[in-house]
Amino acid sequence: MKVILLFIWLVMVFTHYSYAQATDTITIKTFAKENPVVQFNYREPANYDITLKSKYRLLIYFGGRNTTGENEVKSKSWGTWCDKNGVFLIVPSYKNDNYWEPQKWSGKALLEAITQLQRKYPNICDDKLLFYGYSAGAQCSNLFPAWIPEKSRAYASHACGVFHKPSERMKKVFGLITCGDADRQRLIINHRFIEDYRKLGINILWKSFPNHPHDVPWGSTYLAQAFLEYYHKLYACDLDSTIPRPKESRKPIFVGDDIDGAIYPIDSPIGKQIYQEDRVCFFSKELADAWVKSATMP
């Protein structure tokens, strides 16, 4: 019995250390009325090695409106993901002052926080960033990379109601948009955003979640993590100059039907019959499979 209790205690201590003790904060002063001092919560990935020659990527996580970031930076799900991929997590604690508009003040604050973090961890990559957000945070997770596309690699936005104006400047920044289909107003806005990008010949990965209102279904988080991990690994050259740049597929190989959640070969008869507004194109089977699996989750 004592052995069992000791084991349970060790597991609790290890879990607490893994997700709570690895976090810290950076404070940045701004001129924004309600944000004279902004706290940026960050998390160091497990087994961080300061002597490593290749660099560590950054994931910027924007929580819901006016979040303190304290819960997000200690997320077990995202903590596990960051440890697995060797990624630093940074979560802002913006409040009002139109913080989702990076060109006004919040973008500069984020870049200053990254610079400070880099002083402590010199092998952090301040380039080719990853972004994730939901609700008001989803606005940030697409507006921020649109503000600095040259410093961005990929973004995922869930339940978003405000998007950047589609631009060819974003053609090398990969995007994932998800939304509950019961979140009707945002769903319509999402469809319009994706269609505007399609007119520019730029593919945005898309998934709706049936019967979900303005919430965060686990399937959307799973898909976001699979999506960001895919591009994080595909573009390992961002972090190590000795790794060759990947050959990018110019033609999608699968097409998904957002209504029935199934995928088909792009040139198959069924694939060709999918309505334009329900079509989701995939350039890799890995992402196509993750898209299908996400629909089976609560």
Model-predicted segments: where are they?
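Bacterial Sec-dependent N-terminal signal peptides
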Residues: 1-22
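A domain-start/cap signature at the N-terminus of enzymes
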Residues: 18-57, 105, 132-142, 269-271, ...
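Gly/Ser-rich "nucleophile elbow"/oxyanion-hole loop immediately N-terminal to the catalytic nucleophile
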Residues: 46-55, 100-136, 146-149
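Short substrate-entry loop that stabilizes the transition state in hydrolases
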Residues: 48-101, 184-187
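The feature captures the conserved acid-bearing segment of alpha/beta-hydrolase catalytic domains
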Residues: 50, 153-228
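Loop/turn elements at helix/coil->beta-strand transitions in domains of secreted/extracellular proteins
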Residues: 54-58, 84-90, 125-130, 148-154, ...
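Cell-envelope and extracellular/periplasmic
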Residues: 61-66, 118, 134, 141, ...
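Alpha/beta-hydrolase-fold serine-hydrolase catalytic core, especially in secreted/extracellular enzymes
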Residues: 200-202, 210-298
